Amino acid sequence: MFLLGILEFAAIILQMFASDFKVIYVAAAFFLEIYYVFMMEVEGRYDQMTGVYSKRFYYSEIEHLPQNGTYLVFMSDANGLKHINDKMGHEYGDLAIKSVGRSTWDILHSKAKVFRIGGDEFVGFSKSLEEKDMPKYIDAINARLSEDSKKLGFDVTASVGYAIHTPGEDFQATLHRADESMYIAKNEYYERTGIKRRE
């Protein structure tokens, strides 16, 4: 809306100082092109389903992560998504994905960048999150999901894993450790609930 206001203001200025309509039309086309590029950039940065950062933006951002930096990497996804899809339908599965994405974003986005990289998989990284604090953030995410579950009429939970990137470590290696941590949490969920892994 801010950029649209600038365009309107520019159009008024052009009408005041440019008597040649061709100049006005060319300038208007130029400003509209800028607006189009800006909107494409905004849309490309965010995942359309969940509102978190997109997979495209994720690949752009990891290119700028320092190889020698120290930061926390986390992964999360919905528990029992196949069970939800099979028993209730894919539209409910989509609601679960949205809920996990939004809950993760709401709890962590002030401290971390959160991306949806596919399906129900979310990845994030942060220089300010500390490993010792992650359990309370994970509890907060699932508390938010519990609130959503009451509104949606079915249970939505998430498993979250995390790892610390150490200087000199390859990012993919850190991501793999976070993924392994997530699957430990996921196995604990299935053991606790009695739901079979692929249900």
Predicted regions, residues:
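Interfacial "cap-and-anchor" motif at the non-cytosolic start of specific transmembrane alpha-helices
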Residues: 1-44
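A cytosolic-side transmembrane-helix exit/cap motif
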Residues: 43-54
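Conserved long alpha-helical elements within nucleotide-processing catalytic cores of c-di-GMP signaling
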Residues: 54-72, 79-109, 115-119, 123-124, ...
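A structural signal for short, well-ordered beta-strand segments
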Residues: 73, 122, 158-162
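Short beta-strand-to-loop capping motifs
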Residues: 124-129, 164-166
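Catalytic-core segments of nucleotide cyclases and related cyclic-nucleotide turnover enzymes
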Residues: 135-142, 146, 150, 157, ...
